[in-house]
Amino acid sequence: GLRALGVPEQYGGLSIDTVTTAIIVEELGRGDPGFTNSLTNNRKVSAYLAQFAPQHLQDEWFPRYMEDPTFLMANCNTEPRGASDRALQYNAPEAGLQTRARYEDGHWILNGRKQFISNGYLAKLFVVYANTNSSVGMLDGTSTFLVPRGTPGFTVERANEKIGRRFCINGEMVFEDCRLPEDHLLVRDKAMKKRGGYGISGKIAESAQAVGVAQGAFDATASYAREHFQGGARIIQHQVVAARLANMATKLETMR
């Protein structure tokens, strides 16, 4: 189903291209952007694992994901101090990721905190961005790790209250000497640079969702204008209202 958009076909997934994903996300965005956001985050992490995870980890986790309809995944980048501070290319102590990872005795040890992570409060599998080389800038010194829920030293602390997209519950993650096997390293350094099509695809999906939300708002507005009367005529028959609706429709098509 829709949860399988980014899962490879050999695991029963759809492995759908970016354009088709955008069409699906736009339609879903008309109804509930929170549901759509949760869905696109699953798709984003699935596509990332398909591209970067070792084969044995894909063999372990994709079947679990496909068999469990409650299985959510999350992409952990945003932090309390720096937000999604991945655009800064200079190396300064106050800039970039504060979550650190060091290699020790055949394991990776993570320490830090993430917040506002979509799907985070309920997710069972996380892709975590961490600083592994403080001597270079963020684009060259960031690595990604696969962290299952329940890993010792990893805590999902709380859910954040939101005024919108409430179906997609975000959360805060804490890493306190979180110990990961060596093979749970997905991308060693330069993880930001290697996002490639995965990152672009995610942005396209978010944009398509916004178009869907706008289309839903336009549909509701046009329906109201057709059904309600003012000044002895349907609202849509007033020239200024019709002109505004036409302008909205034009902008929607331009966005699409």
Annotated model-derived regions:
Residues 2-72, 119-125, 211:
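Internal helix-loop-helix
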Residues 1, 8, 24, 54, ...:
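Buried hydrophobic positions in well-ordered alpha/beta secondary-structure cores of metabolic enzymes
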Residues 111-155:
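A short core secondary-structure module
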Residues 69-84:
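A short, Trp-centered hydrophobic/proline-enriched beta-strand micro-motif
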Residues 99-102:
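A structural signal for short hydrophobic beta-strand segments in well-ordered beta-sheet cores
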